[in-house]
Amino acid sequence: MGGGGPRRPGTLPLLALLALLAAHGGAAPLQPGGSPALTKIYPRGSHWAVGHLMGKKSTGDFPYAYEEENKIPLSASPENIKQLDDYLQREEMSKHLLQLLEGNENKSAHFSKGGLPWHTRNSWETDDSSSWKDVSRTRCVSAFLTVTFCSKVAYQLCPTSALS
């Protein structure tokens, strides 16, 4: 049977015992009191509260945040009214700017391609892909500015409901 030498009868149980001890000894070392070292298991401390404060914002910037619920979150101070007016003016200016840009692009596209000035074309009727990209980009910018403005105004008017 070609075993290479005589087998000892206790070799297999000895190897099994050695494998069992090696697998059991790979755990975290014990502290002098007998409990495992938590710094080895959790290097940054306990993880029981992970995610508890995720997404929460500080309310220190807003007056009357947690005092009484019948008070408005922002007072009608001249600073707040001025800030809201500034937001409204920026939105109006950006809308006018985008309308001017779209008007200039449409006029240059009509006259350069021999189109009639009274003929209005939709964005899917353009001849090349670059004009379509320009139209869609200006619409995306307009939508982005509108969403940004609306979210800022909503957050300024009611910051507690905007978070949920």
Curated annotation (Swiss-Prot):
<dbReference type="GO" id="GO:0005615">
    <property type="term" value="C:extracellular space"/>
</dbReference>
<dbReference type="GO" id="GO:0007218">
    <property type="term" value="P:neuropeptide signaling pathway"/>
</dbReference>
<dbReference type="GO" id="GO:0005184">
    <property type="term" value="F:neuropeptide hormone activity"/>
</dbReference>
<keyword id="KW-0964">Secreted</keyword>
<feature type="signal peptide">
    <location>
        <begin position="1"/>
        <end position="27"/>
    </location>
</feature>
<keyword id="KW-0732">Signal</keyword>
<dbReference type="GO" id="GO:1900738">
    <property type="term" value="P:positive regulation of phospholipase C-activating G protein-coupled receptor signaling pathway"/>
</dbReference>
<keyword id="KW-0968">Cytoplasmic vesicle</keyword>
<keyword id="KW-0027">Amidation</keyword>
<comment type="similarity">
    <text>Belongs to the bombesin/neuromedin-B/ranatensin family.</text>
</comment>
<feature type="modified residue" description="Methionine amide">
    <location>
        <position position="54"/>
    </location>
</feature>
<keyword id="KW-0165">Cleavage on pair of basic residues</keyword>
<dbReference type="GO" id="GO:0090277">
    <property type="term" value="P:positive regulation of peptide hormone secretion"/>
</dbReference>
<protein>
    <recommendedName>
        <fullName>Gastrin-releasing peptide</fullName>
    </recommendedName>
</protein>
<comment type="function">
    <text>Stimulates the release of gastrin and other gastrointestinal hormones. Stimulates pancreatic protein and fluid secretion, and increases acid secretion from the avian proventriculus.</text>
</comment>
<feature type="propeptide">
    <location>
        <begin position="58"/>
        <end position="164"/>
    </location>
</feature>
<dbReference type="Pfam" id="PF02044">
    <property type="entry name" value="Bombesin"/>
</dbReference>
<dbReference type="InterPro" id="IPR000874">
    <property type="entry name" value="Bombesin"/>
</dbReference>
<dbReference type="GO" id="GO:0034774">
    <property type="term" value="C:secretory granule lumen"/>
</dbReference>
